[in-house]
UniProtKB/Swiss-Prot annotation:
Domain of life: Archaea
One Pfam family matching this protein: MtrE
Subunit annotation: The complex is composed of 8 subunits; MtrA, MtrB, MtrC, MtrD, MtrE, MtrF, MtrG and MtrH.
Main location (coarse class): membrane
NCBIfam families: mtrE (TIGR01113)
Topology term for the membrane: Multi-pass membrane protein
Catalytic activity: 5-methyl-5,6,7,8-tetrahydromethanopterin + coenzyme M + 2 Na(+)(in) = 5,6,7,8-tetrahydromethanopterin + methyl-coenzyme M + 2 Na(+)(out)
GO cellular component assignments: cytoplasm; plasma membrane; vesicle membrane
Entry EC number(s): 7.2.1.4
Designated name of the protein: Tetrahydromethanopterin S-methyltransferase subunit E
Organism: Methanothermus fervidus
Amino acid sequence: MDPAVASLGILALTTASAIIGQTIEDVETNIGSQSNPNSQVQLAPQMGNLHRFFNKAIAGEPFAYCTFCGVSGAITVATLYLHLPAVIALAIGAAITTLIWLAYSTTAYLGRVSGSATFNQPVFLDMLTENLGPIAGHAFIVFFCMTGVAYLMTLPVKGFAHPFPIPVIGMIWGMTIGAIGSAVGDVYYGAEAEFVHKKFGGGIPVASHGDITRKGVLGARSPMEVGNFTVKYGSPITGMAFGLIVLSITRGVYNIE
């Protein structure tokens, strides 16, 4: 195959994986309230507003995804040494990392929410069981895509062959998607999804802090409703932002024309 064609193909696949991974990352962190607006979720019980949100924000998005994308990359490299196909190795790395992510999410939710017991905030076990599945599914896609991007960047093809190992590249991109998720997607989540009962465009005055939207279409609002809200606009825009960054960096650094 012509090296130029191979480089363009890898560039397209890398960009597509970046867009998908970042989009799903924003949805996952919105479902788990692991983002900047989680402070409003944490503050709500203190203001007398009990809720049914899943809150696992004991670590911000950048550091959490930096760590776990690095773990996924390390497991993938270890699996590649077994001479398994790259797709299988990526899937195994993402799957094992997702199991660790579930343990992290469970302990984070129980610890974070039980810390509000002083303000009579209960721990809803159904929120734990109902949301772990979507969190795991979204997290698997993120780890698979980000580790895939790191793997593609190390292929011995003209314009790529990055000198850094896969785990290090995964950590760099993990921190990047966490930062972009906080900077782009969280604006839509925190300023709109959590305050839909407030006047649109009016900002969030200090007096409204903690007064989050707790009622959904039917009964109490659930984390999945937040995910459904943000996936319509905020998450795709976040994915496009990261995809364009990866595309521009890859073309600029490796001179792919």
